[in-house]
Regions:
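Structural alpha/beta core scaffold segments of enzyme domains
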Residues: 1-347
């Protein structure tokens, strides 16, 4: 018996220090969090939002420990860096419902460490103990009983320059779940408004210098192969630069490369492809369910556990209900066009 268990990952939190951008000072407290002198909070999300809610969920983890309103956090997506690797898979990837599981501790520690440093900065500013301060709504509050500044607050943005001079604490205690304010509570989707108003940026909105666009015509059925295709009808259409076949185990189809997406899409609509079918291309819902019923009727399988007397229970039941449910194949796919961007360089 082999059992695989995913353990919480650990990451080294490094203080990135202060930088000046125009009139604003920016503190990169770690790879996931930046606080500006105007008290704006910026979260670098290292997982892809595909409708599953990481944009809101991951921001909530950070906001909980930092003590800020998730709705007031500006979210941007991370670039490529080993620090953003998925600790379950060992590489920078989003999938397998692992985003929160792999980042539960890391992102919370990023927020908690920053909060600790900000509280230290405020305590030193007021000349009081750190235990006499607490963070709330993007500010540190003075709670020292006998201090003249009791009840006053200093925003995170005002404290950033001081906190930027500190080392990241080695001990980063996290909140007890009984003290959670936003984790596990009702939170509105932070990306809902942008998606509803058409202002959200999707992967397909990527625009790089000299970028080309390609569409890929896939086989209509599993295991189909290209028998023939006529590129002559489309290769001279406006903007078309390349038309070629792809024959790989992971992908079979025709790629059309153009200067714009719409040019590639129009050419795709005019493309004629003849597909060679195989035994697998004849598989359909009817044949799949027929095989299921055949397999279910075969009782030669090994019984690994048996409890109770099912036959007797059914015979003596006052009422029995028999029903058969069938569900068609459901593709695990996004609603928007599947897409990706690649920047190929000579080096």
């Amino acid at each position: 018996l082999m059992m695989t268990i995913a353990l919480p990952g650990c990451a080294t939190l490094k203080n990135g220090g202060m930088t000046q951008v125009g009139d604003t000072q920016q503190w990169d407290s770690n790879a996931w969090l930046r606080i500006d002198s105007d008290n704006s909070i910026h979260f670098v999300l290292d997982r892809v939002e595909m409708g599953q809610g990481t944009y809101t969920g991951m921001t909530t983890l950070l906001a909980e420990e930092l003590e800020v309103d998730p709705a007031k956090v500006d979210v941007s997506f991370a670039g490529v860096d080993s620090v953003y690797r998925n600790t379950i898979y060992g590489l920078q990837i989003t999938g397998g419902s692992t985003s929160v599981a792999s980042s539960w501790q890391i992102i919370r520690e990023a927020g908690a460490a920053t909060r600790i440093m900000l509280i230290k900065a405020a305590a030193n500013t007021w000349g009081i103990k750190e235990s006499d301060c607490f963070a709330e709504n993007g500010a540190v509050i003075n709670n020292a009983a006998d201090d003249k500044n009791k009840g006053k607050k200093i925003t995170f943005g005002q404290l950033a320059a001081i906190a930027a001079t500190y080392s990241v604490p080695s001990d980063i205690p996290l909140k007890d779940k009984a003290d959670f304010k936003v984790i596990g509570k009702y939170n509105k989707r932070l990306d809902a408004l942008k998606k509803s108003t058409g202002t959200a940026d999707y992967g397909i909105d990527t625009d790089l210098p000299g970028m080309k666009y390609a569409v890929f015509t896939r086989a209509p059925r599993w295991d189909s192969q290209i028998r023939d295709f006529d590129a002559s009808k489309i290769e001279n259409m406006p903007g078309i630069e390349h038309v070629f076949a792809v024959n790989k185990p992971s992908a079979v189809g025709i790629a059309i490369v153009a200067k714009s997406y719409w040019q590639a899409r129009k050419a795709q609509q005019a493309l004629t492809v003849e597909w060679a079918e195989s035994e697998l291309t004849q598989v359909n819902d009817a044949s799949i369910f027929a095989q299921y019923k055949k397999d279910l009727a075969d009782d030669s399988g090994k019984n690994v556990r048996s409890e109770g007397d099912i036959e007797s229970a059914l015979e003596n039941a006052a009422q029995t209900i028999t029903a058969e449910f069938e569900m068609p194949f459901l593709a695990h796919a996004t609603l928007e066009p599947q897409n990706c961007s690649a920047w190929a360089k000579e080096d």
